[in-house]
Each structure stands twice: as C-alpha cells, then as structure tokens.
C-alpha cells in the first residue's frame, strides 16, 4: 500500500468527497489513511471547508459502512452491549405493534426495555437488520431524538433487548391529554425538528406516529422506535380491510407503502413516506384523534388508495389549524411522493415568531370532529 500523500495528492482526497464511492472503496481509502502517518498528518492539517467536507464524509460514509458490516456479520460493536446482570426488569408496561415493552433499571437509572417479537423462520434476517438499525440509532444525537443506551444480547436472537431512557411523561398523545394547556404547536415544532435532523443524515424513521414520539421530564418531544417496523419485516403489507396486525401503523402509512406495485415503489419506507406520516402526526396532535378515527372496524387501506384523507376539523382554527397550516398538511398527504414538501417547510411555518398557541376550550371527543370524516381532493 502506497504511503505517499501530500497537499498536492488531490486524487486521494477527491476520493473522500466522491458521493458515488462504494463501500469497498471507502474501506480501502480509510484503511489507506489509517495506515499512513503522512496521510494522517495531511488530514490533521485540513482547514475550513476541506476539513468540514472530510469530517462530514467520515460521519456519513463511515456510519453506512459500519452498519453494513454489522448486518452482514450479525454483530454489534462491543461498546453498544450492556451487561445483562446490571439490567433489572420491573414490570411489563405495554405491548406495541412489534415489540413487548417493559420498564426497569440499568445501573440504578430508569430505562425502557423493548424486546422485538420475531418468528422463528425470519429470526436470522430480522436479527441482521436489527444489528444494522441499532448502529444507526446509537449514532444519533439530538435533543428531539430518544437516546439509545444500548442493547442486551444472548446467543438466542429472540432475547435481543433494546434499552433507551425512560420517558416519564409517556408519548406525546398521553402527555397532551394529561396537560391540556401545553403548547401543542411547540411540541410539533420539536417533532419536525427531529425529523429534519434524521433526513439530513439520510436516516428514514419508517414508523412515525404519536405513540412513537415520547416526552421527557422537561416536556420536550423525542422521537423513538427507529426502524422497528422495517426490522420486523413489515415494510410491505398485504392489502386487508379486516385486520390490523401492524400495531395501527397503517393509519399513518403512505399510499406507496400500502400498494408498492401500483406506485412503482419497492415497499420500503423513505423520507417521502416519513413526510406523509408527519402530516398525519400534525393532525393527530392538534385534534387529539387518530387519523381516520371514524374507521373503527377496519384499517383505512382502501380509503387511502382511493385518495381519501382526514377531513378538516370543524373548529380547525381553535385547534391550531390556520388555513395556511391545513393547506400545508394536505400537501404532505399528496399521493405523489415527489410532490410532498420536506420537513423544512413545516419548520418555517412553526418557527414564525408571530405564531402563538391558545388552548381550545374543548377538544374533539368520540371521533365527532369534522365537517366530513374524509376529504377526497387528491
């Protein structure tokens, strides 16, 4: 391996900034760098935009490479693994769509413990995906992202547990119901900020909904449950109007996830499908109701594919839905994924200093809140 590098060795540094570089090439270049003192010296001497570009490359491509290796080899970095005997499970707290949830303690601190449910035939594939997703989640660091503390593993993949900080205020819907005076627009601004952070890193959440947005002790919204739907092998669902075996997730799913063949999709969550779900979260938080709440007997799969979307609330303005916000939310529900705005559009609106929150006197109840249960303007 050549160890000649200098400020004029433009090809070496150009490789680091090439978007199209493959994982094998990335590994080769990083190996070349780490095994060559002169190249390390050059790297340390970078300044300004060059230094930023180099750091961004390592951050972005290094994470991608690490996650791919972990998936291929069914391994997790040792620093992520928590000592099992230091974990104390106290009691079952709930049963989500794809995981059993308990609360407990790790080293004396309260934690949430999730055990992903896996079927025997799919356990190897799901475990590999889990290794990949955990690497990405552990890498994330943002005030509106739920921190991953680590994982507890054994030789049995069915015993794989994910540990995160315990959020005492529950999810955003529980918190809003318990605190009717809370500024829901501020909570939504925090959620959108978190999603924008993920998408900037090209990380897709894949299961955005109120139940997966938690609230910490300071009242700050934090997004959690990254990729659990995809990890569970549910990136594509069978069309069914009679079952809801996906933890209610179908109520937030975009058309291209519900019927990939029709929309030319591979059925995997994308930033665009996240944005569709984000629009549903806005509706959910401001109204206090699940999207398509009037469809109590079956999921809204066919309704969504017919172009139907939640109808405008009867008292939209009092709930925080200005005409501008309602039109914006509807744009996130576009049938065409490419027509959906990025989270920045919502951030621009929610960051307006003139925007104020006035709690409504009454929130919708029993699902009777709209002029019409669905709109079909798409």
PLM feature spans:
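Juxta-kinase regulatory segment immediately upstream of eukaryotic protein kinase catalytic domains
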Residues: 46-84
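Short beta-strand micro-motifs within the conserved protein kinase catalytic domain, predominantly
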Residues: 147-158
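Catalytic-loop of the protein kinase fold
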Residues: 200-215
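Activation segment/activation loop of eukaryotic-type protein kinase catalytic domains
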Residues: 216-251
């Amino acid at each position: 391996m050549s160890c000649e590098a200098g400020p004029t060795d433009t090809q070496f540094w150009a490789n680091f900034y090439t978007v199209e570089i493959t994982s094998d090439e990335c590994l080769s270049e990083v190996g070349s760098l780490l095994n060559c003192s002169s190249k390390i010296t050059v790297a340390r001497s970078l300044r300004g935009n060059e230094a930023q570009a180099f750091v961004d490359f390592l951050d972005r491509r290094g994470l991608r490479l690490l996650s791919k290796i972990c998936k291929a080899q069914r391994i997790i970095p040792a620093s992520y693994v928590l000592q099992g005997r230091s974990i104390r499970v106290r009691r079952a707290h709930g049963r989500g769509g794809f995981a059993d949830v308990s609360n407990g303690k790790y080293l004396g601190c309260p934690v949430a413990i999730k055990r992903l449910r896996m079927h025997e035939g799919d356990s190897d594939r799901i475990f590999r995906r889990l290794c990949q997703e955990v690497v990405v989640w552990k890498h994330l660091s943002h005030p509106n992202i739920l921190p991953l503390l680590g994982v507890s593993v054994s030789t049995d993949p069915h015993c794989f547990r994910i540990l995160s900080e315990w959020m005492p205020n529950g999810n955003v819907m529980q918190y809003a119901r318990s605190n009717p005076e809370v500024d829901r627009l501020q909570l939504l601004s925090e959620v959108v900020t978190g999603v924008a952070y993920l998408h900037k890193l090209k990380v897709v959440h894949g299961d955005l909904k109120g139940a997966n947005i938690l609230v910490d002790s300071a009242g700050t919204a934090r997004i959690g449950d990254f990729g659990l739907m995809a990890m569970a092998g549910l990136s594509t669902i069978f069309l069914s109007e009679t079952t809801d075996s996906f933890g209610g997730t179908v109520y937030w799913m975009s058309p291209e996830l519900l019927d990939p063949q029709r929309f030319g999709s591979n059925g995997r969550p994308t930033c665009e499908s996240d944005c569709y779900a984000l629009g549903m979260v806005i509706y959910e938080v401001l109204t206090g109701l699940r999207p398509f709440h009037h469809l109590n007997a079956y999921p809204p799969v066919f309704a969504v594919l017919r172009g139907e979307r939640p109808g405008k609330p009867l008292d939209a303005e009092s709930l925080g839905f200005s005409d501008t916000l309602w039109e914006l939310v509807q744009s996130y529900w576009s049938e065409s994924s490419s027509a959906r705005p990025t989270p920045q559009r919502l951030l621009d609106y929610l960051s307006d200093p003139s925007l104020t929150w006035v709690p409504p006197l009454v929130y919708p109840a029993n699902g009777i809140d709209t002029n019409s249960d669905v709109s079909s303007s798409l």
